[in-house]
Amino acid sequence: MAQEPPRKQKVVIVGAGPVGSLAALYAAARGDDVEVYELRGDLRDPTTIPLNFTKSINLALSERGISSLKGSNRDGMIEKILNDAIPMHGRMIHGRDDGKLWEAAQAYDVHGQAINSVDRSTLNNALLDELERTPNVKLFFNHKLTGADFQSNRAWFERRAPGDTPLPGSSNRVPEIEVSFDYMIGADGAHSASRYHMMKYSRVDYQQEYIDTLWCEFRIPPSDTGDFRISPNHLHIWPGKEFMFIALPSPDKSFTCTLFAPAAHYAQLESSPQKLFLSFDANFPGVSPDLITPEDLQEQFKENPHLPLISIKAKPHHYGSNIVIVGDAAHAILPFYGQGLNAGLEDIRVLFDFLDKHDAFDLNASLTARRESRRAAFQAYTDQRTADAHAINDLSKQNYLEMRWGVKTPLYKIRKSIEEALDLYVPSLGWKTQYARVSFSTQRYSDVVKVVHRQGRILGYGFASAVISSITIAGILAWKIPGRLSPLPALQSTVQLLGHVWTKISPKNT
């Protein structure tokens, strides 16, 4: 049997958002012919941005995302993205006591590391510009994936460009094209068409959950002098037990803000403008009228959509050697850890690390050999990445409670202070906060969960030992000085405190 002549592989990428665009850069750098198909119009066109971006929450770019971008070896692109980013060194918690407004800063990291607030369009435009300069990449906008055959590796797209006329005699059908490929990467978001078609071939365990929280975007404008109205180097949080309001800085000196609240609360706010203003005054002191006028508050609440939050888990993330899904298509997560973008970009780095490890781009190998290498790489990717995707999904849900309420509690501050002190003064222990491990390292998410649980157990046992020692000393003193010292009140309060602290710092609550 004659050996197949070597040739380039062709990869079809569905979705031209940040994750799909980075996947295209990685594949192109390895010699593949790349075609990127995007349902929407060219995202760089300012006239199409309002139509395309149903989600304009500023993105938080941290170490995982940055290191994955660097893996593309496009230094100029990365420099542009980071130059336009605004570093946030911590949270700024806002509140009011006895009628007086207060704010309290909480640093993210004892070593001064920061996460970066980036504009969604700035990031996407930089990636698309880089793709357009890459000779073995073709971009196709206004193309909707309508079908896929992962046995013959063919896909069908409807071309939906403005001005296209329906086919004669059809019921508003538009022209459809057929595309062949060696493999497909699905990066088309939470409501992924590529995942939908993959599930016809692969037995996918799929879980979708909408939490009882809606979100609506607001904007704090620049001051009259054209400056930021509040500190630009913090993520600002107005926490509440059932809801919260956050603000992230933007390059134009404004803040992109988001109200997260249950659907029932939104229904109350929609009933009258007065209820909206009173709710903000009671729960988010200092926002209106100080930062947003009541008129703007009402207009933005009325005009901007009230959108749900979706959480998705799926396994496996691939089918054979034919398709792999990444980003929100594989694991849509809640935005409360700022890891949605970072996890998606990290998917690409991890995926191509496995493809490289299995020699899937060896031009000297036959197509059959490369197909088997790709199959093994996709399987290894699924085996590792599903565990990590599920871990950050769960961590993001847990962090919602912390942001709404935990950041104000003394016990949260105590544990954070202890862990940061150990990190700073005894670095040989390798002790770090959960937030630092998630945001300022590339440690696997699933490993972060294991290590943080172990740290929680150690802290709990250490605290218990300290309390038991105190009780023992109190008992000895009471025995030595009878009649002068009754240990009972101290014992009762200590036991109560121990039980309360243990429930907060034990592993199931970390």
From Swiss-Prot:
It is found in: Mitochondrion outer membrane. SUPFAM superfamilies: FAD/NAD(P)-binding domain. It comes from the Eukaryota. GO terms for biological process: 'de novo' NAD biosynthetic process from L-tryptophan; anthranilate metabolic process; kynurenine metabolic process; L-tryptophan catabolic process; quinolinate biosynthetic process. GO terms for cellular component: mitochondrial outer membrane. Its cofactor is FAD. Pathway: Cofactor biosynthesis; NAD(+) biosynthesis; quinolinate from L-kynurenine: step 1/3. Keywords: FAD, Flavoprotein, Membrane, Mitochondrion, Mitochondrion outer membrane, Monooxygenase, NADP, Oxidoreductase, Pyridine nucleotide biosynthesis. It is an enzyme of class 1 (oxidoreductase). Its EC number is 1.14.13.9. It catalyses: L-kynurenine + NADPH + O2 + H(+) = 3-hydroxy-L-kynurenine + NADP(+) + H2O. One of its GO terms (molecular function) is FAD binding. Belongs to the aromatic-ring hydroxylase family. KMO subfamily. This is Kynurenine 3-monooxygenase. It comes from Aspergillus oryzae (strain ATCC 42149 / RIB 40). The gene is bna4.
